[in-house]
């Protein structure tokens, strides 16, 4: 008996050990799942946005052109009905336009003043429009300072030192510049040139401030409503904000992106002085000024006042001064001499630029009836071609933007129709359920008053 008890205790003390198979070298703690795994399905809004990004002229011109024309027609109809909704304003505007047209065409001594006012209004409106286009860009990145305002300031500066005067004959100034017949006895100074081009520069700067208003109102409305608008710059702004909150943001973001994120996070705390500071300095850290201030619900006058003062007054005087100093007396020739010292390509760069400057000087001294030289250098031809391509690309960006807006309009209309259809189906389904309620007489046993229960016998 003792032997049997001993054997039974030995059997009961036996344990089973499970050994794991040896892991291969450089293996992870967890095995990778087999198969492709599960991927999240994009929403209809995401698919719609991805499709809209493909609607560009160089990919789908047969869709872009009709969509752009339809969007223009829709905008015209909407504007017409909005004008009709304000009948008093419409009546006063029509009367004012009628009086202005009558005064414009009526003969009299006032015609001289009318022509002067018209000339100034068109000239000033042109620079404001260029500033707005430079700020908005519509996705093209068009910076009209490099195309129009910068060359205008440079031409006035070079003409001032060449002619030794700023009293350019009008006309043809400001369309073209010619030296006056008599030279001034007073030397041309830096501040005189600044005063000559100040109006155009300030109007251009005011236009850039006005161009920040649409993104400001868009971002402000999106923040208040909680809906994300279909805007590429706003999505870029939100991605930068969300990426900065992650734990490994310092590794993912570059130094410029981290600096831009810091500015956009703290601009609403700095308020008017901070917005004025960043709007006054030409820097890439504040390129989304309207979106940033609108997203953080900065008050309108704090945003627009600081942006207007910073861009139109401070920043424009900085850019003006830089261009005037760069193209002032003999600085252009010194720059050409520096270019000539570049190995291999220096002499080839110097000659076209020297020819262009010499041709510009000769054009300044021609008389109004004199025939000018029509030959064009390769450098001038290349610059004209570059400007033409930039303007053409800007025009195509406007067409693409209109086509995308019409595609979004179609999507919104389709979504509203689907929502109305679903609401109608749900309503009809609820009505059918109410009609299909079972009457009490269809089940007399369970619903009768004398029914007390069921007795189950074993």
Curated annotation (Swiss-Prot):
Keyword Cytoplasm in the entry? The reply is: yes
The alphabetized UniProt keywords are: Autophagy, Cytoplasm, Membrane, Transmembrane, Transmembrane helix
What domain of life is recorded for the organism? Eukaryota
Q: Does the keyword Plastid apply?
A: no
Membrane-topology annotation of the record: Multi-pass membrane protein
Question: Biased-composition ranges for Acidic residues?
Answer: 422-436
**What processes does the entry annotate via GO biological process terms?**
autophagosome assembly; Golgi organization; macroautophagy; negative regulation of autophagosome assembly
Q: Which residues cross the membrane?
A: 89-109, 121-141, 289-309, 379-399
Compositional bias of kind Basic and acidic residues: 7-32
Q: What happens when the gene is disrupted?
A: Defective P granule organization and degradation. Early autophagic structures and lgg-1 puncta form an irregular shape and clump together. RNAi-mediated knockdown results in increased lgg-2-positive autophagosomes following fertilization and at later embryonic stages.
Cellular location(s): Membrane; Cytoplasm
Give expression by tissue. Expressed in pharyngeal and body wall muscles and intestine cells.
Query: What's an example GO cellular component term for this entry?
Result: endomembrane system
Family the entry assigns: Belongs to the VMP1 family.
Its biological purpose: Involved in autophagy. Thought to act in autophagosome and omegasome formation.
Q: What is this protein called?
A: Ectopic P granules protein 3
- What lineage does the source organism belong to? Eukaryota, Metazoa, Ecdysozoa, Nematoda, Chromadorea
């Amino acid at each position: 008996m003792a032997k049997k008890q001993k054997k039974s205790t030995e059997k009961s003390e036996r344990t089973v050990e499970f050994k794991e198979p040896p892991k291969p070298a450089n293996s992870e703690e967890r095995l990778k799942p087999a198969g492709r795994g599960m991927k999240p399905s994009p929403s209809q809004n995401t698919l719609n946005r991805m499709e809209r990004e493909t609607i560009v002229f160089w990919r789908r011109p047969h869709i872009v052109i009709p969509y752009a024309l339809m969007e223009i027609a829709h905008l015209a109809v909407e504007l017409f009905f909005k004008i009709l909704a304000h009948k008093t304003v419409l009546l006063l505007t029509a009367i004012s336009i009628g009086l202005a047209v009558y005064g414009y065409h009526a003969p009299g001594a006032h015609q001289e003043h009318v022509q002067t006012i018209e000339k100034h209004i068109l000239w000033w409106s042109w620079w404001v429009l260029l500033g707005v286009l430079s700020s908005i860009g519509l996705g093209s990145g068009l910076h009209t300072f490099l195309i129009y305002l910068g060359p205008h300031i440079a031409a006035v500066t070079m003409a001032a030192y060449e002619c030794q005067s700023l009293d350019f004959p009008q006309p043809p100034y400001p369309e073209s510049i010619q030296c006056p017949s008599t030279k001034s006895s007073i030397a041309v100074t830096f501040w005189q040139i600044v005063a000559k081009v100040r109006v155009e520069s300030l109007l251009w700067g005011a236009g850039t401030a006005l161009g920040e208003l649409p993104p400001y109102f868009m971002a402000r409305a999106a923040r208040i409503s909680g809906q994300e608008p279909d805007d590429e710059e706003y999505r870029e702004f939100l991605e930068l904000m969300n990426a900065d909150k992650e734990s490994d943001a310092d590794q993912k973001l570059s130094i410029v992106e981290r600096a831009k994120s810091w500015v956009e996070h703290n601009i609403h705390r700095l308020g008017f002085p901070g917005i004025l500071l960043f709007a006054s300095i030409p820097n890439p850290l504040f390129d989304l000024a309207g979106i940033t201030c609108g997203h953080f619900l900065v008050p309108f006058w704090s945003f627009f006042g600081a942006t207007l003062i910073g861009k139109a007054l401070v920043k424009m005087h900085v850019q003006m001064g830089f261009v005037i100093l760069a193209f002032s007396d003999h600085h252009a020739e010194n720059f050409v001499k520096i270019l000539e010292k570049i190995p291999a390509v220096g002499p080839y760069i110097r000659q076209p630029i020297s020819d262009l400057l010499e041709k510009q000087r000769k054009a300044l001294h021609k008389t109004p009836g004199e025939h000018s030289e029509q030959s064009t250098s390769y450098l001038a031809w290349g610059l004209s071609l570059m400007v033409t391509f930039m303007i053409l690309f800007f025009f195509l960006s406007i067409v693409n933007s209109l086509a995308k807006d019409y595609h979004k309009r179609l999507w919104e209309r389709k979504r509203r129709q689907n929502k109305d259809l679903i609401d109608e189906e749900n309503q009809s389904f609820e009505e059918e359920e109410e009609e299909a309620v079972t009457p009490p007489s269809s089940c007399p046993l369970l619903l009768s008053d004398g029914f007390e229960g069921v007795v189950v016998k074993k």
